[in-house]
């Protein structure tokens, strides 16, 4: 444990930031999981309400991912990759339902 006052403060700040970053990453994962589950549900049973839910969930996920990248929780390339994956998943489920 540090003895110097400024080092003690830095330990407290690092712990606070770690917990905040952990919560942000968990929220991003939860929103991504919600989008993927909604898109698979839409592929199995296409309903217009489900499509609206997908769009709302995707918007929320994109917003949270962008905020995480802006604050430095996620790297900008990681954020771009996650957004691209979500878009690809949704596009595939929409294409599968329109083809059948």
UniProtKB/Swiss-Prot annotation:
GO terms for molecular function: small ribosomal subunit rRNA binding; structural constituent of ribosome. SUPFAM superfamilies: Ribosomal protein S20. It comes from the Bacteria. GO terms for cellular component: cytosol; small ribosomal subunit. Keywords: Ribonucleoprotein, Ribosomal protein, RNA-binding, rRNA-binding. The keyword Iron does not apply. Pfam families: Ribosomal_S20p. Transmembrane segments: none annotated. InterPro entries: Ribosomal_bS20, Ribosomal_bS20_sf. GO terms for biological process: translation. PANTHER family: 30S RIBOSOMAL PROTEIN S20 (PTHR33398), SMALL RIBOSOMAL SUBUNIT PROTEIN BS20C (PTHR33398:SF1). Belongs to the bacterial ribosomal protein bS20 family. Binds directly to 16S ribosomal RNA. HAMAP family: Ribosomal_bS20 (MF_00500). This is Small ribosomal subunit protein bS20.
């Amino acid at each position: 444990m540090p003895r110097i006052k400024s080092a003690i403060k830095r330990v407290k700040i690092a712990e606070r930031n770690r917990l905040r970053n952990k919560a942000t990453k968990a929220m991003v994962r939860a929103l991504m999981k919600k989008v993927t589950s909604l898109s698979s549900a839409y592929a199995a049973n296409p309903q217009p309400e489900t499509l609206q839910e997908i769009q709302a969930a995707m918007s929320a996920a994109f917003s949270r991912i962008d905020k995480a990248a802006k604050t430095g929780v996620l790297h900008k390339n990681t954020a771009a990759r996650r957004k691209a994956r979500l878009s690809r998943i949704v596009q595939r489920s929409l294409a599968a339902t329109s083809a059948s």
